[in-house]
């Protein structure tokens, strides 16, 4: 409706049309999402469509890409990550990776940035106990969760993945890994530790990636504890703020991790720039005080008069946030716990051939995720046993996070 039409109809009528305008936009966005090839079928249970702006969290599924159970069509998105030399492209996304989605249209991703926290050799590998295993990677503590630790989602463990080459021993001391997750304070270690959402074998490199929570402001800072690794910053981030998440690349592998010099450092916390749109931030709550919560080094103020339930330390949440007048972030709505955040539910949808569907009993990869062989009764219940080899099949699998290949809880097939 143009300005002339508004004047003809009068100012009182135009507000009445706004709900219809919003409904039309929502229908158009839903149609675009369904028709552009990023997703298949209806939204699976508990999954909503993401909005525009920024969303940061953990990949919980595919078909399009699910970030803390919010769906974004990634079929035309630019996939990228940061490296020691700057931004580089990425071929694919993986379950359990931490990512940052930027979108200018609701539910449609313009870019997806992979946010790894550690890359380098394992120095220590403890035995699993009580559903938890501890690693020390590039001097930092990593907590691996198994399905026995029911209070949080299990870690996706890509033990013998595509990069193991001729050395496919289990992940342990000396093996290079890439780790994703959330930084939380651990009272037992008296340090911030990386609660891992994904640990995968990686190829050795001439640069290691180290990250953590800065303990003080400065150009040289310690991370994760008062006696943690000291990093001399360089590159994009010359000075860090206290309690900020930083990521830094270190040339080669130092003999000790007490003090290192970065070739490049960047801010890991979510920045609230002057033009920041509302954002969604998911992860484990690291800190709660009277007027704020902290997730991965990002402080989120709790507005005065907030009537909702305050998140608890260690709880995994998804928070809708907005920029404050002071330049930070504040809660915009009551935080929610993404469905399956405590149980580690993974949802994967993909289009495969009928011949591939016939091999579900032996196992296969869907969207780059290895799925173990599916039991015959589950295949029959999901309509996956009587599919023509030449048919196009939309398959949907629900599984549990954990070591690859993932074990399917349920599967459904629909032939076109």
Regions found by a protein language model. Give the residues of each.
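Sec-dependent bacterial lipoprotein signal peptides
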Residues: 1-35
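Short, flexible, surface-exposed loop segments at domain boundaries
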Residues: 2-3, 31-76, 82-416
